[in-house]
Amino acid sequence: MELDDFDPEDKEILSWDINDMKLPQNVKKTDWFQEWPDSYVKHIYSSDDRSAQRHLSSWAMRNTNNHNSRILKKSCLGVVVCSRDCSTEEGRKIYLRPAICDKARQKQQRKSCPNCNGPLKLIPCRGHGGFPVTNFWRHDGRFIFFQSKGEHDHPRPETKLEAEARRAMKKVHMASASSSLRMKGRPEMKGLPGEIPSQGSLPLTWSFQEGVQLPSGYSTPLIANAPQQNSLNDCLSFPKSYDLGGTTELEDPTSTLDPTKLYERYKFSSSKVYSAEDQFQPPVPGVYGDYDEAQTWNKNAVLGRSPTDDTYYPPYPLPVASWPCDYLPSQSSLEHSPQQVPLEPPAAQPGHHPLWTNPGGEPYEEKVPVDFSSYVPSVTYHSPQQDPFLLAYGSHPQQQYALPGKSNRWDFDEEMACMGLDHFNNEMLLNLCSLK
């Protein structure tokens, strides 16, 4: 159908050119937006069309210089294909969208094919007389005029949405691959069978002879008790507190000293006390917070032996595994080592333990004010198995400790309860070892 057959208004609509000074404005019907415009075509879009406002096209177009500022000119870049002409699993060919920038496009050609890792190549567009196909855009009044010159001589590249989706999938694959490589490069550290655990993972326990150099005179009683103490340590480890009722947070300042210096200081202070004919009160071997609940372990019937039986006790007054003791500071300002309050030395009774009374003697008339239910020592010293304080008592194995005076004697029932609790704790530890 020729132009002469149309009305003058229709002829004006069909015969317009993008470079005309005046474009038709009596357009009654606008066109639908075309995503793949090809060949020599013209379209009139509404100014409200969002795609026309953005000058979109599925062809890879870039802006080119134009002497007319009212007209936007775009040229086709062609398509990037695989030099091996490979296909995906779905049977599609690899037609990538060329980059807009010249340097980015040159860099893109040096990359490998995303499907077969083959080299890529660019197929330029030569559909307009040996030149790229050109698109023209012009805004005039209520319409947007579009005109294409030339016919594309190459396959259609992937759209922008498809290119963005492909890049996103590539990033996801790269992230998963890098994470898997990191997992393989840093496997979990697992302990080998029979491997000794590190010291940081072991509980805090006191070894039997940890850093203490003992004189030859003290080796015999300690070595005799070493197997028993080691077996107790193997069965039950205490976190630096030997009170079964709970850990004690208070600690004596002298516990931070070097063991050798601590031993020498205590040896010196003990020698001064012995020279003044004052003797230490032996520590109570079982001071617990739950003393009221342990009254059932009192009396001789529970122990099953007489209080004057010396075969059960060691030749020195303190056992190796002693419990926390209350040490009061010395009244002399020149002495800084913890000492116990000395008592008046009465007449010595050979053949009897210093904690027990003379058989047939009078009962004790006064009691030492000691509250076992709320025992909070002013200065509490945690005595481990290798405590140098214990060694000072062993320095006088031949000396017999005298009975305490009547003015400061312990009540017989309280002493029996303390000794019964000590015996009960030893039996409980042995039972735990046998169960383990």
UniProtKB/Swiss-Prot annotation:
Zn(2+) 2 binds at residues 82, 86, 113, 116. Transmembrane segments: none annotated. One of its GO terms (biological process) is cell differentiation involved in embryonic placenta development. It holds the Pfam family GCM. The keyword Cytoplasm does not apply. InterPro entries: GCM (IPR039791), GCM_dom_sf (IPR036115), GCM_large (IPR043020), GCM_small (IPR043021), Tscrpt_reg_GCM (IPR003902). SUPFAM superfamilies: GCM domain (SSF90073). One of its GO terms (molecular function) is DNA-binding transcription factor activity, RNA polymerase II-specific. The keyword DNA-binding applies. PANTHER family: CHORION-SPECIFIC TRANSCRIPTION FACTOR GCMA (PTHR12414:SF6), GLIAL CELLS MISSING RELATED/GLIDE (PTHR12414). This is Chorion-specific transcription factor GCMa.
